[in-house]
Regions:
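Surface-exposed interaction/gating patches
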Residues: 94-97, 157-165, 169-172, 187
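Short, intrinsically disordered, charge-balanced linker/junction segments flanking boundaries
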Residues: 1-5, 11, 20, 205-207
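Catalytic cysteine-centered active-site loop
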Residues: 170-184, 188-207
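N-terminal ordered "arm"
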Residues: 7-8, 120
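Short, conserved micro-motifs enriched in small and acidic residues
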Residues: 11, 84, 176-180
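Boundary regions of SH3-family modules and the immediately adjacent low-complexity/disordered segments
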Residues: 1, 18-24, 32-67, 71, ...
Length: 207
């Protein structure tokens, strides 16, 4: 969860595997998200990685996003196996080559490795590049829809994705399947389809 500087008021939500950057150290730190949003969070919730790690992850192209409301990470490739973690829609994982019984092995940013159903994942389409090129004022404006997609296909995918949030409760600042706000829905359905927009419901220069 991201907060205002007071650490009380919620402003946004980031998910497992998402990248952020920060400059100052402390118990609470201000972070920049990969979509240009700022907020405060507890330092101990962040798994520290290098810029080189982020760039290598981008280059490798094996980052996948959870598309189901929730997906359990299991020790083995079967439903009876021990559950290691539960991920929500929007979380990023590294997909490995190993597959078995309709499951695929994934690696999480904290180093945990386990199996999730292959049907719960889709290749990530958005990018972290803003974080190592924050001075690029037109980064978000110049985004395009995924290569090979028509505008009609993109619009259809956005609508289909939005339907996945039907029945979710309202939660201020939320972007998850168990609680989401109005601008959070719009942000997430665009992110899931490869386009990063401003997180809040207002006109923002540069987006």
């Amino acid at each position: 969860i991201l907060y205002e500087e007071n650490g009380v008021d919620v402003v946004d939500e980031v998910f497992f595997g998402w990248s952020v950057m920060w400059e100052d150290e402390g118990e609470w730190i201000e972070v920049w998200t990969h979509y240009g949003y700022r907020g405060w969070m507890e330092r101990n919730l962040i798994e520290e990685k290098s810029r080189e790690w982020m760039e290598e992850r981008e280059k490798a192209g094996n980052t996948y996003v959870v598309t189901r409301g929730f997906a359990d990470v299991m020790r083995g490739a079967r439903v009876q196996s021990r559950m290691l973690e539960t991920l929500g829609r929007g979380c990023f994982v590294e997909k490995m080559e190993e597959t078995e019984n309709g499951y695929c092995r994934v690696k999480l940013a904290n180093g945990i490795s386990g199996f999730v159903p292959e049907v719960a994942l889709r290749k990530r389409l958005d990018s972290d590049r803003f974080l190592w090129g924050k001075s690029e004022e037109r980064f978000f404006v110049e985004q395009g829809i995924p290569e090979g997609w028509s505008e009609e296909k993109f619009r259809r995918k956005v609508v289909e994705c939005a339907k996945g949030y039907l029945g979710c409760q309202y939660r201020w600042g939320g972007k998850a399947a168990d609680g989401i706000d109005c601008s959070g829905v719009v942000f997430m359905v665009y992110l899931m389809n490869g386009v990063l927009i401003w997180r809040d419901a207002d006109i923002r220069e540069g987006y």
